[in-house]
């Protein structure tokens, strides 16, 4: 334990998954907790340390400390791949498997730091197990769509004959995709992680957006489920090499541009790139497209659209683009972080979910009336003409006015959640758990 920390301060160890998006939301929550007499330790791999340092200002140098977590060494997974950022897709399972073996090093960290509380992520069954052996309370911070967590908990806790037929919110079932069945080992492990959470579960959402799903998850698991808000990074001071993007947007009319981005981890296929490019060109709507790498699939497209669009093959300041007055729509894979940012800035979503929880996030956005999912053909390929039609409806046409208004309404609610302090009930429950181990 650091002797410089005030004895009246509660020490909390946070353990996010090894993805930048997960680390980012834990870091936002950590910063908010430091205003309430909590000292935070954030554990991650050595490879992620520089990202964390880049996102920590001197303001938090005394209240948030970074702790390296050592993953087992492996010739198949060298040190530079101890992160999902830039991880080749075929190594995703290897990283997850190696991460599950980090328990012994995590135990050493906990013994040294002697925290009052551990806050862990979605896939770390070993973390609450290690904390329990040391008599340290641990809770889970779930950073995705609560509607999906409610479905998972339902599938695992109800008898098989009561599974989907009795789930009260069928509106979140994804389009043209298989629904998970009860008995899935992945769901079982995931729900076990939730059940290990001591008394409460924190969720990255709001009652206004997912109140009925939050209540159902709480009832199903028999635990308090407490929303902590969107936990998104605010638009930041721009670097010189990004100012030109804002100047380009400044020349466009209000709410006339669609932003296109599929996150830092999903790699679009050439077919997907061609379909999206065709749809954008057909829509005749201005766009900013952040793509991981330009390919031959874009040959001719960039010249044809001219000043109508930007195609950028490097990192872009997503929050700044979404918050710009010219941005009127967001073509997104519907990762939860991107979904939260879109809602935060009142921008309606043109949803193109690709994997994982994204189809459920897309359905939620349709259900609340702040987005439309683009349809696919019988082989799962995006419909080019429908891309154009949905973009025009969401950004331009009168028929999309209700969607635009709903997105703005949710944006105002999220803004208030961002500006407010952490909910008093959340702090009260965290203090109670810390005092159990004081």
UniProtKB/Swiss-Prot annotation:
Q: Which SUPFAM superfamilies match?
A: UDP-Glycosyltransferase/glycogen phosphorylase (SSF53756)
User: What processes does the entry annotate via GO biological process terms?
Assistant: carbohydrate derivative biosynthetic process
Annotated catalysed reactions: cyanidin 3-O-beta-D-glucoside + UDP-alpha-D-glucuronate = cyanidin 3-O-(2-O-beta-D-glucuronosyl)-beta-D-glucoside + UDP + H(+)
Q: Which domain of life is it from?
A: Eukaryota
Describe activation and inhibition of this protein. Inhibited by copper, mercury, UDP, UTP and partially by calcium, cadmium, iron and UMP. Not affected by cobalt, magnesium, manganese, zinc, nickel, tin, uridine, sadium malonate and glucose.
Mutation: residue 148 to A; reported impact is: Strongly decreased activity
**What Enzyme Commission number(s) appear in the record?**
2.4.1.254
Q: What is stated as this protein's family in its record? A: Belongs to the UDP-glycosyltransferase family.
Q: What is this protein called?
A: Cyanidin-3-O-glucoside 2-O-glucuronosyltransferase
Q: What is the lineage of its organism?
A: Eukaryota, Viridiplantae, Streptophyta, Embryophyta, Tracheophyta
Gene name as annotated: UGAT
């Amino acid at each position: 334990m650091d002797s410089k920390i005030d004895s009246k301060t509660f020490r909390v160890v946070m353990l996010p998954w090894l993805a930048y998006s997960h680390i980012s939301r834990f870091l936002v929550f950590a910063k908010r907790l430091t205003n309430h007499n909590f000292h935070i330790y954030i554990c991650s791999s050595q490879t992620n340390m520089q990202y964390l340092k880049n996102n920590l200002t001197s303001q938090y140098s005394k209240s948030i400390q970074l702790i390296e977590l050592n993953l087992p060494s492996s010739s198949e997974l060298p040190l530079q791949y101890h992160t999902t950022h830039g991880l080749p897709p075929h190594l995703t399972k290897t990283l997850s498997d190696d991460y599950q073996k980090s328990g012994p090093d995590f135990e050493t960290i906990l013994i040294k730091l002697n925290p009052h509380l551990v806050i862990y992520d979605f896939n770390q069954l070993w973390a609450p197990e290690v904390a329990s052996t040391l008599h340290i309370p641990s809770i889970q911070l779930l950073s995705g769509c609560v509607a999906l967590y409610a479905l998972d908990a339902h599938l695992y806790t109800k008898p098989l004959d009561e599974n989907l037929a009795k789930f009260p919110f069928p509106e979140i079932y994804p389009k043209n995709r298989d629904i998970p069945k009860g008995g899935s080992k992945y769901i079982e492990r995931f729900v076990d992680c939730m059940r290990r959470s001591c008394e409460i579960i924190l969720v990255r959402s709001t009652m206004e957006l997912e109140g009925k799903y939050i209540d159902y998850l709480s009832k199903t698991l028999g635990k308090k489920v407490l929303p902590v808000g969107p936990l998104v990074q605010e638009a930041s001071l721009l670097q010189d090499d990004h100012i030109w993007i804002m100047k380009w947007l400044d020349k466009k009319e209000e709410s006339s541009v669609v932003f296109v981005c599929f996150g830092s981890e999903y790699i679009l296929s050439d077919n997907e790139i061609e379909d999206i490019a065709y749809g954008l060109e057909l829509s005749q709507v201005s766009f900013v497209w952040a793509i991981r790498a330009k390919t031959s699939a874009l040959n001719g497209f960039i010249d044809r659209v001219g000043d109508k669009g930007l195609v950028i093959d490097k990192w872009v300041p997503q929050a700044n683009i979404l918050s710009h007055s010219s941005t009127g729509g967001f073509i997104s894979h519907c990762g939860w972080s991107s979904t939260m940012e879109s809602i935060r800035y009142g921008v309606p979503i043109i949803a193109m979910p690709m994997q994982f929880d994204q189809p459920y996030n897309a359905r939620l956005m349709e259900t609340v009336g702040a987005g439309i999912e683009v349809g696919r053909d019988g082989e799962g390929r995006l419909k080019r003409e429908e891309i154009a039609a949905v973009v025009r409806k969401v950004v331009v046409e009168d028929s999309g006015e209700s969607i635009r208004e709903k997105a703005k309404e949710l944006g105002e609610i999220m803004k208030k959640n961002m500006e407010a302090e952490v909910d008093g009930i959340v702090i009260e429950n965290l203090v109670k758990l810390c005092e159990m181990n004081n």
